[in-house]
């Protein structure tokens, strides 16, 4: 069997790498993606919002019956389509992320193959796919993977415009603008800023920037961008007027970048350094080696190494300078980091499996265990279990003195749960009067000072977990 595999590799290394990459993509990006509940907060509320699109106008997002105008719609459209095709299940909600991630993996392979060889393309695609960031965020249905995929395709296509024949350049540039346009519908202005900065700097350095502004490419691109983006933005403006301009563009585009205090997401300048180090495991040590080699060996003289260095620095640098920071923001920096790391490993080739790799693999397992622990001890699993328990009983569900949790809506489907958002004993008494047989979910930390403590003393404690408790009325 081993001899046949070796012979197949010898006869057709390209096919061997593609088949192996397909198998690894299936294992890393698809297997088990529906085996665990949705993670609060974004994944669960985005899933509910996507499901609700199936019942009203697809232009207008709603969250708990309130207009949600801070995000563009593409992620929600894709997820809603998957839910319509496959039902409202965890795997259906996450499937689009896995598909987009897999396309990005194979696109990365072909770019790497074009630059050096099929082996280099495989190394790069494997590094990009098999790290904590990419695996974890492919398996969580949030906007970042959609944006990362479209941004990566846009930048790759910008690179391909240098390789294709003149007769095919118009198609390549058109594809570039189409991906950028849909990226704008996924994340907004960053889908324009990043490709223009990266491709623009690269073209300036290589003295070929004039091609970008040729009318047959640039004007066609502008028309494509407007055709794709005007309908939704116009519909939103007609529906919500100046409020849409303020919330969508000013507050969540510009304010988020320069004044994140208003959104509670401000972080220090170097915030992403440890975040990316952990997220890029098990390749982080090799990436550091690649950075050292970049300066020590003056690798910036290589056209493509310089391109991916610019690619990484622009994304990592701009996100670091922004006032608002979340760990997932820096996911788009993984593809260029994979290329730079692949260069480093490709040059070492058979010598690369040494101490740093073993240390990195160990660190990755530790990181994954920690991340899994954070997710499953953060309360989401408790809400899922409590909601399912109430769903399978004859009891009505009430949540008390806690924010709206989409995980409850996803798993309690008999009717609408009563949501009491603050510590209001009168509202609790009224809910218990209306529903004689009820179960109540409450945060443990809120119980000691609750004004409804006497009411809870007359209820039965069904389950007490790390973050939440479940009570029920006594017959």
Language-model regions: role of each:
Residues 345-370:
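Signature aromatic-anchored transmembrane alpha helix within multi-pass, membrane-resident enzymes
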Residues 2-351, 376, 407-414, 449-450, ...:
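Membrane-integral, polyisoprenol-dependent glycosyltransferases
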